[in-house]
Amino acid sequence: MALFSFRKPAAPAASGADLEAFLKGWSIEVMPRTAEKVADFRAILPLGTRVYIAHIEGTPIEEMVATAKRIGDEGFAVMPHFPARIIKDKATLTDWVSRYKDVGVRQGLMLAGGVATPHGEYHSSMQLLESGAFDGFERLHVAGHPEGNKDIDPDGSDRAVMEAARWKTAFAERTDAKMAMATQFCFDAAPVIAWVDRLKAEGVDLPVHIGVAGPAKLQTLIKFAIACGVGPSLKVLQKRALDVTKLLLPYEPTDVLNALAAHKAANPGFGIEQVHFFPLGGIKTNAEWVTANGGLSGKPARAA
């Protein structure tokens, strides 16, 4: 049973080569507590893989920096989150950036953060970008929302989101740092394709690193999808839950990635540059799936 309902009658089919090419340079997200469960990232990830470190409210900066140092020392590009709404003031931001620089970090993901009330003077990623604190960083990524963000646009539109995206594109033109838009995870290719095309039409030319949920139990994914505000593509999971033959099987991102890989192969100028995984079913499980499905793009640095 197909999991997608595309409007176009015939979607191109991906080849194994298409998927391998699409997964090249993929990244993955961890938290300090999940990173602790991995004995050696070199046993599961290709050398140089970008590893985002999610900064959840309440996590001490010392734990974040220690995790960044450990993963960087193992040979991976580290990109910690900088959630604006949990950063108290410029002094705190400057301290965080300095600590990360001391352990070799030169990349960061700017985002507002899922906190209703800001802890201090920052409430948006644009304020962080304008702060000047990230001089010397080689990469500055920002967040993207293919299915909208009601925290930003409560009316359900994407007016404010698109306005911010255009501002970030203009900022990218005046900075030396490489920029890209890393997105929330989605489960359906159709709204992603429409959104990426719309970005281009709106004059937003930041490369998209599309967020995809890694293999996980269906119940786990539905819980995270609801909590994170994933919209239209949640129907993909709900439809799967109604199929008793699939209800107990783990979800795998094969269909959505094959569809996106085929679209990219047929449209080389399509704005998705890389895939970013949210390992909701575990880092090792996610990495093993990429190794099994991505050919050389998933080959770990060394055998476990």
Give residue ranges: language-model regions.
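Active-site beta->alpha loop and helix N-cap motifs at the rims of alpha/beta catalytic domains
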Residues: A2-E163, A170
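Conserved beta-strand positions
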Residues: V30, I53, M110, V142, ...
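Active-site pocket-lining/capping segments in soluble small-molecule metabolic enzymes
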Residues: V30-P32, S124-G148, D158, A164-W167, ...
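Conserved, mostly hydrophobic/aromatic
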Residues: P80, K168, A177, I210, ...
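Active-site glycine- and acidic-residue-rich loops that bind
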Residues: K88-D89, V115-H123, T183-V196, L218, ...
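Short acidic/polar active-site loop segments enriched in Thr and Asp
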Residues: R106, M179, E273
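Short, well-ordered secondary-structure micro-motifs
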Residues: G120-E121, I152-P154, I193-A194, Q219-C228, ...
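Hydrophobic, aromatic-enriched interface-forming segments
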Residues: G156-R174, K178-K200
